[in-house]
C-alpha cells in the first residue's frame, strides 16, 4: 500500500480529491483520539499494542481508513509528504509485428519454418504483418485519481496498461507520442523510476514454500522508506505495513500459511490472488497499473480491492489505472474516470458518472438491471448493444472513434491535457521535487537515477534473508542430499576400501580421485533446473524495483554456501578415509579445499548456462556436451599425451582437469610404494634384468598453481553468471495467435487492431447465436438428462496438520432435468470441494459422509463417466486440435455400441453448438500461442458435452477470467443446454444482476461449507431477496445487484461483518424444512420406481470403451503428442548425435594398443553418462500427460490407468529406434569398431548386434525413466531417484572396478546392474578376437641375462602370464607387452564374447522389469484404493 512511506512528498495537491470529505466522522474521531494519545509520531503510526485500537492491524477493531489518515497526518507533522505521479498522454499509437495465425510445428515440418527464421535474423520484421493495436489515444489521470479501463479481451486493454507503465517489450510506440508523468519524461520514468510506475499482470507467481507473511515482509522491506521517526526500527515498521495490507485484503489469517502453487499445498486460489495484489501494493508505487487483478475473486473481494485502491488514492494521492473484465457496479462507482476501448480505438475517456449518458445520447438503450460497466462493454459487441429505433448511432470501431474525436467531451479533454502540461512542464519544478523526495526515501549512497530504494548490498542482504527463509521452509532436500552423499560415499568408497601401500593400488587411487572429482563437480548440475522455476518471480520483482536480478543471484550463491560446505564434507570425509588416501592432515585438508573449489567452479558454470538460456530445452544439450567434455578431458579417461591436437585446448580450460591434477600430485608426491609385480617374476631376477610393471610419471609440484587457476575460474564463472542473470530474460510469448495443423489454416484477415498479447481474441469472441438454436431446442442429436440427482447431509472432513477440519457441513440439495442451478459462496467456502464430492472426485482424500443418490439408487462405478465435469482449470493436451480433443472424448466416453460415424457426427454438432467452427482445427497450445481463455472455456464444455453425460453436468467457474459479454455468451449456452433437458450445477464468482437472473435455483454456502440458502431465485430475484430481508438483511435497493447484496449480507468481504448467524437461520427456516420434505419425497418416489427399471448391464461398466480400443486411441494420441513436440524429439536426437559424435571424434580411430583399448572401453563408459540428460528430457513430457489424465480423464473414467502407462511407454519406442541409428553410426564407425569386426571376419554380425545393443540401451533408459517418475509428484523427485539408481548401476558396471577387484559384498550389485550386461556385450562385440600392438610407451623395458635373447629369457614367464616380446631375437633392451590379444583385456573386465547374445537377452528382462515396476508403483502410489465414504 502506499503507506509505504518510501515516499516522502509534498502535501496533497489541489487537484487531488480531498480526503477529509471521504473520511467518516467515526474514522476522524479515531484519528484524533489516537494521534493525541501517542507518545510520538512514530508510536501513533504503530497504534500501540492495544487490541481495541483502530490503528492496530492485529486487532479486531482495525480501521484501515483511520490508520491511513493517521499516517498521513504524522507524515505532514514531520514536514514531509507523499510522492505523486499523474500522467497525460497524447497521440499514442502502438503497433507490433506478428501473424494472426501459424501452422503447428511437428517433427516433419519444423524445417519448413527455417527460411522464415533465417529471414528474421537479418530482417526482424520480414514476413510479418504490422498490427495496429492502439490508435490515437489521449487522456489525463491526475494524482489521486482512479481510472478503470473497459473493453473485451483483445481490444487492447493490456497493451494500454503496459504502454503507460513503460513495459513495451515487443511493442512499438509512435515517436511523436507524448507522455508527461507530472513533469517527468517517459524515458526518465521508465529507466530511473521504474519502481514508481508498476504494471501488475494477472498471473500469480510466488515462491510456494514461503509463507504469506514472509512473502509480504520481503516486499515491504524492499520498498519501504529508509528514514523513519525516532523510536521505530525499520523491521518493525515493515511488519506493521505488512499487517495493515493483510488486514485490508482479508488475508491476515494466512500469515503463517504457505503461498503454495499447483504442486505445493498452500492458500486458496482467491487468497493467492490477494497475496499478489498485496505484494504489488507494498511496492508503494505512486503510479500503479493493474491488469485484470480481480480475476478469481468473488464480487465482494473485488469491490474490497477497489475500495483499498480508493483509500490509497484519497489519502496518499496515488494514481491507479485498472482494467476489469467483469466490473461490479459498486466497484465502478469508486473510479473517477473510465476509458472504453473498442478494437484498439478509444471511444470514450472521461468521468465515470457521465459515460453512460454519453452513449445513451448517441442513441443506445441501457436495459433495466444492467450495470453501467456491462452497458459500456456491450457497446463493443454488435450483438449486445441496443440502438434506439429513432437514431442512427455509430456501428463500426472507426465510426465510434470518429464520433468521439468530434465530441465536445474530447475537446474538453484536450484542453484539460494542455492545461496540465503547462502546469507540469517536463523537467520543471515538479520533476525536481519528485527527485528530491525520492532521494530522501532512498538508502544512503543510492543514486536518485536508480529505480531501487535499497543499495546493492542491502538488496543482497534482503535476498539472503529470503533465501534462508526458503531453506528453513523446506530443508528436507538439503538433508536428503547430505544423507544421499553419505550413502553414496559409503558405497563408492567400499569398492576401493583400504587400498594398500603398493603399486597395485595406483590404478585404484587414480580411479578413486577421478570418482571424487567427478561426483563433486557434477553435484551442482540440478542448479540449472532450479533457476527456471524462480525466473518469473525474479523478473516480476525486478520490474517492481525490489532488487537487481544479479543481487538475487549473488545472494543465492551465498545462501547455498553452507549447504555446499556440509554436503562436500558429508561425502568427502567418508570417502577419503575409507579408501585410505594419503592420511596426513595437510593432504586431507588440501584435498577438501580442491574438491570444494571444484564444486564452486562447476556451480558457476551450470548457473551461467541456466541464466544464459531462455528455456530448459535450450540448456539441456549444451550442459550435456559440456559435462561430457569436462569428464573426458580430466586427464584420467584420456591421458594428456593421448589427446588429439584439435581438442587439446579443452583440457586447458577445464577446471576439473586442474583439480584432478592437483589431487594426483597431493596423493603421490613424496611417497614411496612397494612394487607389487615385477616383470619377469623370476626368483633370480636382478634389478637390471627385470622391471616393475607400472607406468612412470614426471615429477612436479603443481599444488598451488592449480589452486590459483581454479579460484580464478570460480570468480570468472560466477561473474559471468551474475551478468547473464541481470540481462538475459525468460522467453517471451509471441502474442496470442491461433496455431493450426499445417494444411488446415483458414484464411483469416488480419484485424489490423487489437491487443498483441491477445491478438486472436476478437476472432474467437463469436456469439453463440451463430449456431442454430433450433438444434438444441429440437433436441437433434443432443442428449439431455432424465434422472434426478439429490444429496442429503453431505459432509466432508479433512485432517490438516494433525487436526480434523470440516470443509462441508450438512449440505442438502438436488438437480432436476432442465434446471440450471448456481452454486455460490464466500471465498473459501468450499464450492469447488462440494462439486468434487458430488462428482465423486475426492476418492481417497478425506472422509465424505451423507447420501448421494441418482433416482433413489446409490451411485455405482459408472457414475463418474455418466456425469460431465467442466473444471475451472481448462486442462487440455497442448498439441491436440479442438476437433481431436472432442473426438477423443467421444470415442472413449460414449457407449461402445454407438457407431463411430455417429460419434463423429455428434462431435460436429457440438462444434456448431459451441460456435467453434472457425477454430475447430486450431491447436490448443499454450496461453499466448494457441486458444485464448474463452476458446479454452468452450472446449472444456465441449469435451464434456460430446461424452453425452446421461445424468448431469457440473461446471466450475465457467466465467472466470472472461469479460461480461463472453460470460453472458457462456451462460446463454448453459441455459440452452438446460432447456434441452440437461441438469447443470454451476459455480460462479462475480455474476451481474442480469447474469444471476438466468439461473433457476441457488445453493449458497457460508464460511466452513455451511449452507445458507437452497431454493428458487425467483423473478428479478424476488424469492431470494424476500428470504434474506425477512430474516434480517438490510433491504436490497432498486437497481443494485442481488448477488453482491447477498454476499455483503453474509459478510463475505474482509471489511464487512455479518449481523446474523445465517447458517443457523437457514436451519431454522421453513424453507429448510421444505427442502427436506422434497428430498424425502424424491427418495420415496425413486424407490417405488426401482422395480420397474431394467437397465442395460453394460451401463454399469467402469469404462465405456473396451480395453483394446482404449489402448489404440490413447496410444495414437500419445504418439501424435510426441510427433508434434519437435523441441523434445530433436533435443533427444540432438543429444544422442552430439554425444556420440563428440566421443567418436575424441577417440577417433582408436588404435589396438593397451591405451587404445582403454580408450575404447571408456568411450563406451562415457556414452552411458547421457542417461541423466535423457531422463531429464523425458520426465516433463510424461508429467504433462499424467497431470491431464489424473485431474480430468481418470476421474471421468475416460480410460484405464494401465492404458495410460502402456501408451506412454510404447510411444517412446519409435523415437528410441530413430535416435539409436544416429547414435550407433556416429559411435561405431569413427572410433573404429568396424575395423575390429572386419579383422575378426565378423563385420555384419557385429555391426548389427552393436546397433541392437544401442537400441536396447535407449529402450532401457526410456522404461527406466517411466519406472522412476511413475509414482512421484515432480520431475525433481523422479530425477533424484533415477540419478541415485543410475549412479549405482554406473559405478558397478565393471569399468571403473572389475568384478575381481570388488569386495565380495558388492558383487551382487555388479550382477544386479543392468549396465554390467550391456557393457560386457558392447565390449565383447566391439573388439573381441583381435591382436593387440603396444605402443613404445607401453612396453616394459629391461635387459636379458648375458647370453640369452629376449625371447628365450621371457618364454617361461609368457607361458604363465601371457603377452609377447617386441623382438624375441634381441639381446638387450627387451620390450615386453603385457597383452597379446583383446580377449585378455576382456577377461580382465569379466567380458566374454560367447556371452554377448545371452547378455542381450538378459537386458530385455530388465526392460520388462522396468515396465512391470512402473505399472506396479503407479498403482500403489497414485491410484485411489477405496472410497472414504460413510
From Swiss-Prot:
Stored PROSITE patterns: ABC_TRANSPORTER_1, ABC_TRANSPORTER_2
What are the binding positions for ATP in this chain? 825-832
State a single Gene Ontology molecular function. Answer: ATP binding
Which Pfam families did the record assign? ABC2_membrane (PF01061), ABC2_membrane_7 (PF19055), ABC_tran (PF00005), ABC_trans_N (PF14510), PDR_CDR (PF06422)
**Could you tell me how this protein is used in biotechnology?**
Eupenifeldin is a bistropolone-humulene meroterpenoid first discovered as an antitumor and anti-leukemia agent. This metabolite also shows anthelmintic activity against the parasitic worm Hemonchus contortus, anti-malarial activity as well as antifungal activity.
- Give the disruption phenotype, in one or two sentences: Abolishes the production of eupenifeldin.
Q: Which GO terms describe its cellular component?
A: plasma membrane
Q: Which domain of life is it from?
A: Eukaryota
Question: Which residues are tagged as glycosylated in the record?
Answer: 292, 684, 1019
- Cellular localization per UniProt: Cell membrane
Its topology with respect to the membrane? Multi-pass membrane protein
Residue ranges of every copy of the ABC transporter domain listed in the record:
112-368, 789-1032
Q: Where is this region: Disordered?
A: 1-26
- Give UniProt keywords alphabetically: ATP-binding, Cell membrane, Glycoprotein, Membrane, Nucleotide-binding, Repeat, Transmembrane, Transmembrane helix, Transport
Transmembrane portions of the chain: 476-496, 511-531, 557-577, 586-606, 620-640, 707-727, 1133-1153, 1213-1233, 1249-1269, 1278-1298, 1305-1325, 1400-1420
Q: What does this protein do?
A: ABC transporter; part of the gene cluster that mediates the biosynthesis of eupenifeldin, a bistropolone meroterpenoid that acts as an antitumor agent.
Listed PANTHER family? ATP-BINDING CASSETTE TRANSPORTER (PTHR19241)
Member of which family? Belongs to the ABC transporter superfamily. ABCG family. PDR (TC 3.A.1.205) subfamily.
Name the UniProt record assigns to this protein: ABC transporter eupT
Q: Which species is this UniProt entry from?
A: Phoma sp
**Gene name of the record:** eupT
